[in-house]
């Protein structure tokens, strides 16, 4: 059975009081048996604080970014061993904002992906097309390139990882793919991975990220190949985020 996941990407938002209150409210509101693994990904400076605030075991902490070296002269960066010291379970790699603003290419994303796996954490590989790429019929071509970039290490590379489909045109815009559009791409990704390792494809957790909110989550999560969500803006509101989590049930 595939792991269901709802992950909140807080991006560069919040200060210590807001972060503390938000994570405490989320835990308090999840007073039910949850079918999904719930994760929050605060700005890296607040990872220790969030970890220390988590009391119930119903929410885990993750990281938004990583640098693919264990240590060294890489000013301002954080390695997987450092993140693991603070109990990070998930790490985002390849988010469209990293690709766009920091010019991270496929090779660099692949290095991050395997660096996270090599240190016993779970990478969430983000893939997705821009509006221009979609309008030009290149969606599957772009996503295949992004997915297959991490496959150089062999047929087991998609074991113990998550892939998030985040159409770039839907991030922070209020637009979202229809459940049917999202399902089509999720099925494409699963079939693509199946060409490498059929067993891993069947067990691969695929989540959708692209303006997920409490109004569209239930329809999205009802699709057969959508196993949860990567939530942006709505994860900064505890009530909205937990309403999304409830939709997994």
Curated annotation (Swiss-Prot):
Pathway: Carbohydrate biosynthesis; gluconeogenesis; Carbohydrate degradation; glycolysis; D-glyceraldehyde 3-phosphate from glycerone phosphate: step 1/1. It catalyses: D-glyceraldehyde 3-phosphate = dihydroxyacetone phosphate. Keywords: Cytoplasm, Gluconeogenesis, Glycolysis, Isomerase. One of its GO terms (molecular function) is triose-phosphate isomerase activity. GO terms for biological process: gluconeogenesis; glyceraldehyde-3-phosphate biosynthetic process; glycerol catabolic process; glycolytic process. Disulfide bonds: none annotated. It comes from the Bacteria. Pfam families: TIM. Substrate binds at residues 9-11, 172, 211, 232-233. It is found in: Cytoplasm. It is an enzyme of class 5 (isomerase). One of its GO terms (cellular component) is cytosol. The keyword Transmembrane helix does not apply. Its EC number is 5.3.1.1. The active site is at residues 95, 166. Its main location: cytoplasm. Homodimer. Belongs to the triosephosphate isomerase family. Involved in the gluconeogenesis. Catalyzes stereospecifically the conversion of dihydroxyacetone phosphate (DHAP) to D-glyceraldehyde-3-phosphate (G3P). This is Triosephosphate isomerase. The lineage of its organism: Bacteria, Pseudomonadati, Pseudomonadota, Gammaproteobacteria, Legionellales.
């Amino acid at each position: 059975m595939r792991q269901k996941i709802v992950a909140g990407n807080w991006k560069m938002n919040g200060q210590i009081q807001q972060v503390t209150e938000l994570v405490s409210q989320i835990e308090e509101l999840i007073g039910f048996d949850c079918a999904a693994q719930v994760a929050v990904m605060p700005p890296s400076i607040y990872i220790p604080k969030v970890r220390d605030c988590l009391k119930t075991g119903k929410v885990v902490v993750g990281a938004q970014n990583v640098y693919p070296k264990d240590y060294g002269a890489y000013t301002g960066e954080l390695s997987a061993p450092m993140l693991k010291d603070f109990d990070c379970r998930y790490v985002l790699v390849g988010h469209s904002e990293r690709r766009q603003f920091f010019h991270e290419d496929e090779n660099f994303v692949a290095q991050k992906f395997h660096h996270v796996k090599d240190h016993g954490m779970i990478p969430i590989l983000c893939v997705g097309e821009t509006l221009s790429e979609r309008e030009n019929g290149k969606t599957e071509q772009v996503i295949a390139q992004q997915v297959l970039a991490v496959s150089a290490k062999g047929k087991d590379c998609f074991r113990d990882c998550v892939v998030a489909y985040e159409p770039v045109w839907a991030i922070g815009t209020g637009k979202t793919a229809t459940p049917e559009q999202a399902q089509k791409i999720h099925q494409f990704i699963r079939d693509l991975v199946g060409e490498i390792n059929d067993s891993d494809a069947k067990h691969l957790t695929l989540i959708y990220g692209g303006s997920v909110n409490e109004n569209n989550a239930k329809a999205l999560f009802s699709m057969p190949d959508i196993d949860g969500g990567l939530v942006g803006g709505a994860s900064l509101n505890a009530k909205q985020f937990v309403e999304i989590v409830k939709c997994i049930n």
